[in-house]
């Protein structure tokens, strides 16, 4: 009995410590990244997401408002069966429950941003995105509903552009061909006329010269020449 009485103070102290530590152990559901005393659910955290489709993936930029008192942001994206989905960017610590822990103690900013990437085939409307904003050992928790984003189809080239190009190009080719043809014809006609005129003049000159030579070289021309010399000599003497 005396030994039991001596153990009672120690048992009471142990029970007090267990009761004191139990709230923090039950509240810390983020997988040993950090111990939280209290977690409050809030719908006024003004968390926003913006999607950007690239190739076969869609990247959501998650923006969380913070201040100098915020020491960390914890993010978690899980499917309906509580399995994790997607990949996160930046420097973080991965917790045991598939959440990611971003330490902000050395940063001073008004917003925290990170990227979450999933395949375009993933139905993100069934994904539960949880955000915890940690101040000291107290966290405000909020869930964000994601919107499905489909990749936009490429814009086809309007047919009117191709038609316009054909209409504008064809007259130019025809005009060029017509101009070249007319120029060739004009050059040919001019060359022919010039050649004909030159040939005619040359032929006429050659004919007259030949006629004069033939006239002077005939017997009648010689007789006339002798008679002319005889008459001139009579007049002089």
Swiss-Prot record:
It is a lipid-anchor; GPI-anchor. InterPro entries: PLET1 (IPR026184). Residues 145-170 are annotated as: Disordered. Residues 219-237 form a propeptide. GO terms for cellular component: apical plasma membrane; external side of plasma membrane. Residues 1-27 form the signal peptide. Residues 145-162 have a biased composition (Polar residues). Its main location: membrane. The keyword Membrane applies. Induction: Up-regulated during calcium-induced terminal differentiation of outer root sheath (ORS) keratinocytes. Present in hair follicle cells and sebaceous gland of skin, ciliated epithelial cells of trachea and bronchial tube, striated portion of submandibular gland, distal convoluted tubule cells of kidney, ciliated epithelial cells of oviduct, medulla of adrenal gland and anterior lobe of pituitary gland. Expressed in keratinocytes of the hair follicle at the trichilemmal zone corresponding to the terminally differentiated outermost suprabasal outer root sheath (ORS), including that of the sebaceous gland duct (SGD) and the directly adjacent upper distal end of the companion layer (CL). A lipid is attached at residue 218 (GPI-anchor amidated serine). One of its GO terms (biological process) is negative regulation of cell-matrix adhesion. N-glycosylated. Glycans are attached at residues 30, 67, 103, 136. Keywords: Cell membrane, Differentiation, Glycoprotein, GPI-anchor, Lipoprotein, Membrane, Signal. It is found in: Apical cell membrane. Modulates leading keratinocyte migration and cellular adhesion to matrix proteins during a wound-healing response and promotes wound repair. May play a role during trichilemmal differentiation of the hair follicle. This is Placenta-expressed transcript 1 protein. It comes from Mus musculus. The gene is Plet1.
